[in-house]
Regions:
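Catalytic-site microenvironment of enzymes
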Residues: 1-263
Length: 263
């Protein structure tokens, strides 16, 4: 979304708000129509729910940073079907960025290929024993330097008992707007792609480094359990990954259009 230049600068606050609301509504509606086109069972009457977006502000111009968790030698979790978390995270993150870019939201990715980010800024000559710490620190540094207004970190879950399944969102306790963003993503997941999902959002503990050390609205989306055969089979499917990306993108768009997101 290009908000620069005299035409936009010369708008009064009310006009800017209307403009931003229109753009953010377009994002949400476009995403939901994409979901229908992909055949994920989103009923037409449900799409109308997303047309009513709260009055927006020019805060919907904020950069959204999408963080594909893990990467490179850090593969994250793995499934019995051979799926690696790092690969799925990157794939879904790229789809989210594509959807947001098409609709005019400035979306940036912490990584666009299969690598850790510990040496992104070349701070040390020797990262032995420090790779994971610097990888996480640099993801936050990237978001800060991008002047991000929101951070969405994409991950996969795994548990030693295979019966657990479903998407779940964790939110940073450091910004009041993290929780509404998490709630919207969780809500849309249940409505549009996981009707059986009864999980609730959770406040991130201090063990989740990125959620602990950021001050901007931030959520971590555990898209499913690689330890669950059903989830793993879905996550191996390209169409289902697109459904996840559309769900997250549409939820983020409606959140961006809310007046609370501007605070």
């Amino acid at each position: 979304m290009n908000m620069k230049g005299k035409p936009f600068e010369n708008m009064n606050t009310s006009a800017k708000n209307r403009y931003c609301r229109t753009v953010c509504e377009f994002i949400a509606v476009s995403a939901m129509f994409a979901l229908i086109a992909l055949g994920f069972g989103c009923l037409p009457e449900r799409v109308s729910d997303i047309y009513t977006v709260s009055a927006g502000t020019d805060e919907c111009a904020r950069v959204v940073v999408i963080d594909a968790g893990h990467g490179g030698e850090d593969g994250g979790a793995s499934g019995e079907n051979g799926l690696l978390e790092k690969d799925i995270n990157l794939d879904i993150s790229a789809r989210i960025k594509t959807l947001l870019d098409i609709c005019g939201v400035d979306a940036e990715m912490t990584r666009t290929d299969d690598r850790m980010l510990y040496d992104m800024y070349g701070e040390l000559n020797d990262y032995r024993g420090k790779k994971k710490t610097y990888d996480l620190k640099n993801r936050l540094r990237f978001a800060k330097e991008a002047n991000a207004g929101a951070l969405i970190s994409i991950h996969m879950n795994k548990f030693h008992q295979p019966q657990y399944s479903g998407l779940q969102v964790y939110y940073s306790p450091n910004n009041a707007e993290s929780e509404p963003l998490a709630a919207k993503i969780q809500e849309y997941a249940e409505i549009y792609i996981q009707p059986e999902n009864e999980r609730e959002i959770k406040r991130a503990t201090s063990a989740i480094y990125i959620m602990k050390h950021t001050e901007i609205p931030a959520v971590l989306v555990e898209c499913g359990f690689l330890s669950n055969p059903g989830d793993a089979a879905k996550l191996a499917d390209s169409g289902y990954r697109t459904g996840l990306a559309v769900t997250v993108s549409a939820a983020a768009a409606e959140w961006l259009a809310s007046p609370e997101a501007a605070k």
